[in-house]
Amino acid sequence: MSRPTSSRSSPAATAVDLLLPDPPRGTVSAVVFSPTPAAPHINALASSWDHRVHHYRINSSVSDSASTSTSDQDLVTKVQAFAHEAPVLDVCFITDTLAASASVDRRVRLLDLQTGKTLILGKHEDSLLKLRWCPQTQLLVSGSADRKLSFWNVSLEDPTKAGLFKTLDMPDKVIALDISPPFPLANGDSTPIYSASAPGKPHPRDPTPRLVVGMTGRHVFVYDLLPLHSAIDREQAGERVAERDWQPDQKRESSLKFMARDLRCMPSGDGYATSSIEGRIAVEFFDPNPKVQAMKYAFKCHRETVSEGADPLVVGVVEGEEEMETPYDVVYPVHGIAFHPK
């Protein structure tokens, strides 16, 4: 059976695409935008396998009224690049001027966008794969191939107190995690939002800060970060904390049969979506009520059906192997998913 080999080239840039000055020279692992973009600039960070986090500044005042005569240099400028000792697998914003990075060299770094300085917060025992910042609890969370989940004190007021708060053992490697809700609400903002749990019916967001952790072996843990943060505070104060206080609120098995590639929480705060290497996405909800759980679903995506005489993906057949019987599906891994804030 021959294995299809893609002969496609990347699509050409359109008139509305922006070409980044001095782009990353390796595979881009993550792209994030400043949490509270303020005119006239928006900060963007791109982590890469070229051992760097690249910092770009987007001129939003120009891009809003951009014309064909506006050059990319007027829209995007490269501010700096933060060098690491190994490929960088993830990056997240903490404030508009402070970010954190996850690297194969096992270290958790803080990146000061104003001064260009880097601070090593701590390290794991194996490659650091994912990290997220929870603004409600002021916790930085990191997940690693060492099967550990770590919570860090960034200490924005006193950098000398920054360091490790707590490390929890996981049953498998942490390959995905996210904070719910992913877009913090502004003070007093009660604008309804649409959710997959109630199609076509806007309802208030669930503001409960949760951490969703996806692992190899299809494990999914869900933590309520408010009681977890309280347990961390009690332990830091010298109090004894029961083992049950460190346990997740929910232990689940992924609806997807194959390993996850990404996990993102819904803006509504009531669920999350996961993607897999087998071209599928699953949508799940936190509420354990059977009626709510009955609404979870999964769907296929990023697939192409190849029929007889229409096989644009196969370049050639390896000698000695049989041709694949048509029709068949070419399945692509879903490496990344994202929700629009609204």
Q: What are these language model-derived features?
A:
Residues 20-51:
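Beta-strand-rich domains and repeat architectures in extracellular enzymes and scaffolds
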Residues 20-28, 72-75, 81-88, 122-129, ...:
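WD40/WD-repeat beta-propeller blade N-cap
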Residues 26-29, 49-54, 86-89, 105-109, ...:
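Short coil/turn segments within WD40 beta-propeller repeats
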Residues 27, 40, 84-88, 98, ...:
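WD40/WD-repeat beta-propeller blade-loop signature
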Residues 31-41, 91-97, 131-138, 178-208, ...:
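Loop/turn segments within WD40 beta-propeller blades
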Residues 43-74:
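Beta-propeller domains
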Residues 44-48, 99-103, 140-144, 211-215, ...:
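Conserved beta-strand element within WD40/beta-propeller blades
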Residues 57-68, 154-159, 224-241, 283-296:
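Short loop/turn segments immediately following beta-strands, especially the blade-tip
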